[in-house]
Amino acid sequence: YIDGDEGILLYHGYSIDQLAENGDFLETCYLLLYGELPNKQQKIDFDRCIMRHTMVHEQFARFFHGFRRDSHPMAVMVACLGAMSAFYHDSINITDPQQRMIASIRLISKVPTLAAMAYKYSIGQPFVYPRNDLNYATNFLHMCFSVPCEEHKISPVIARAMDRIFTLHADHEQNASTSTVRLAGSSGANPYACIAAGVACLWGPAHGGANEACLKMLQEIGSVKKIPEFIARAKDKNDPFRLMGFGHRVYKNYDPRAKIMQKTCHEVLQELNIQDDPLLDIAMELEHIALNDEYFINKKLYPNVDFYSGITLKALGFPTE
């Protein structure tokens, strides 16, 4: 449920603030799948079920070698998700509730593995297998950033930030990618094909690509000294330039996800002791201006979730693309 005027986002009656601060992503997944939060035993069983299915078919390793190493990760993800219907064709009957649930479990458990493999392939490092003894977010970061030749420890602050990013993006009513998935599903297409279509839609700069576009804008600005010039351009109706990461088509108030992401972003920067990154300096100054400039306040152009998530993901070590 979304109330754009009041800046409210609820998942089955629970505010996004409650879920992000007091729960975790898999708890949110359970809520979205079953309509209620799990009790202690249900949470243990659900977490165990997800973590036991994180490995992907070994042939996927060969599948990746068909891509150029400089392929955009979203192109790789669309292909991999579509390919899941070939590797896991025992759960593609969309009319069977049990098969739909199996497909849902497989998607939640295996997509982080495929995403990490896409990243590792792009930088020429060996794939890292998932570890069932780690929680969901920590496991994803482990697969992305650990290497076989040395031990890699992940800070709880960093893992918590990743988990919050997952939770904040778990659902957003009838957005473009959700509409795409539902449209594909209306034809009776299998769940993996439907999700692949949704990921293709998510690739667009007006949707999931917004945080990437925001970081590219920060690169275009180049330095803190040039911010006033770009602010003036953003206010000029005749200039095609616009600030990415500010305002939202649904929220006419502060994006509730942005408040959580803002806090998370600053926690990550403090944990990693990042103080001299020029892009982050530009972002922090832009944030300060947007929250104090009458033009932005009157037009309700507050920093949105994409503004903070892009900065946070960059700080965590993910490349812009």
UniProtKB/Swiss-Prot annotation:
It catalyses: oxaloacetate + acetyl-CoA + H2O = citrate + CoA + H(+). This is Citrate synthase. Keywords: Transferase, Tricarboxylic acid cycle. Pfam families: Citrate_synt. Belongs to the citrate synthase family. The active site is at H248, D306. It comes from Bartonella bacilliformis. GO terms for biological process: tricarboxylic acid cycle.
